[in-house]
From Swiss-Prot:
The lineage of its organism: Bacteria, Bacillati, Actinomycetota, Actinomycetes, Streptosporangiales. One of its GO terms (cellular component) is cytoplasm. The keyword Hydrolase does not apply. InterPro entries: HemC (IPR000860), Porphobilin_deaminase_cofac_BS (IPR022419), Porphobilin_deaminase_N (IPR022417), Porphobilinogen_deaminase_C (IPR022418), Porphobilinogen_deaminase_C_sf (IPR036803). NCBIfam families: hemC. Binds 1 dipyrromethane group covalently. This is Porphobilinogen deaminase. Its EC number is 2.5.1.61. PROSITE patterns: PORPHOBILINOGEN_DEAM.
Length: 320
């Protein structure tokens, strides 16, 4: 086996490098392949514009994909929730890592729970999905769009600029800030972003059929099946990762995959929620079962007007 390290492309943030380093460690432990990190700056890292103004799709992954196609790195690691659903020519999703906790977390001043925040309290989040679902629960709070890494956002609470922020629990875990969490939203309260908590490993298609086949060593099939169902919802609704769409799939038995999804108006006033379960053994494999499940649930939601809520949210991008 070659001792030349495989080059792993990653964004420069603490969260990105921590999660990429973890993937590298697992890959090396399972395959013996040494890995070195190559730090890459994405457009999403340098722009000060709010993600809803940018469309929210691909702003954190395009630079990594460019580096892949240019041969500057062998593979790249992304937060799966940032990955566009449309395929990119020449690039393949080689692996989906085992999912971390997919839930959203509240980090509030004075240790406050979400239910205990006073009316009018300011809650920072960069996600229309979170704003929509939180507003449905607590329309009396003021939701403020914010940008920046986890440390920057948490600093706005510490400084008193905001009463609370909402972030992904998995992300807080990856940067060692779980002590800041004051409340955690169960998926029955706030459905996470499709793919939240999982990491995506991409490489060039031509390499995956040959020298980089070893990347399958970090692929976790149950997670891949679950996030496939979730991402099909996004694709069928023609919604980007900045849309107010939540989805979560999980195996409720060895052969039963359940998918829950919600599309909520950005002010929380309208919502289409749906749930469906599929028996995986009725299909050739789990990913095909997940794809069929996602398509059926998306079709049911579109019949209830979910696509119109997505379109309305896109037309009023400045709302969140």
């Amino acid at each position: 086996m070659s001792t030349t390290p495989a080059r792993l492309g990653t964004r420069r943030s603490t969260m990105a490098t921590n999660q990429s380093r973890r993937v590298a460690e697992i890959l090396t432990a399972r395959t013996g392949v040494p890995v070195e990190l190559v730090l890459i700056t994405s457009f999403g890292d340098i722009t000060r514009a709010h993600l809803t103004q940018l469309g929210g799709t691909g702003v954190f992954v395009s630079a990594l994909r460019d580096a892949l196609l240019a041969g500057e790195v062998e593979f790249a690691v992304h937060s799966l929730k940032d990955l566009p659903t449309a395929p990119t020519e020449g690039i393949v999703l080689a692996a989906v890592t085992e999912r971390d906790d997919p839930r959203d977390a509240l980090c509030a001043r004075d240790g406050l729970k979400f239910a205990d925040l006073p009316p009018g309290a300011t809650v920072g989040t960069g996600s229309p999905r979170r704003v929509a679902q939180l507003a449905a629960l607590r329309p009396d709070l003021r939701y403020v769009p914010i940008r920046g890494n986890a440390e920057t956002r948490l600093g706005k609470v510490a400084s008193g600029e905001l009463d609370a922020v909402v972030l992904a629990y998995a992300g807080l875990h990856r940067v060692g800030r779980l002590d800041d969490v004051t409340d955690v939203f169960d998926v029955d309260q706030v459905l996470p972003a499709p793919g939240q908590g999982a990491l995506a490993v991409e490489c060039r298609t031509a390499d995956f059929t040959g020298p980089l086949r070893y990347l399958t060593a970090v692929d976790h099939l149950p997670t891949r099946a679950a996030v496939t169902a979730e991402r099909v919802i996004l694709a069928e609704l023609e919604a980007g990762c900045a849309a107010p769409v939540g989805a979560y799939a999980e195996f409720v038995a060895e052969d039963r995959l359940r998918l829950r999804a919600a599309v909520v108006a950005t002010d929380g006033s309208q919502a289409v929620r749906a749930e469906q379960t599929v028996t995986v053994t009725e299909f050739p494999d789990a990913v095909q079962a997940a794809t069929a499940l996602g398509r059926q649930l998306a079709h049911d939601m579109i019949e209830q007007g979910a696509d119109q809520i997505v379109a309305d949210a896109a037309a009023g991008r400045g709302e969140s």
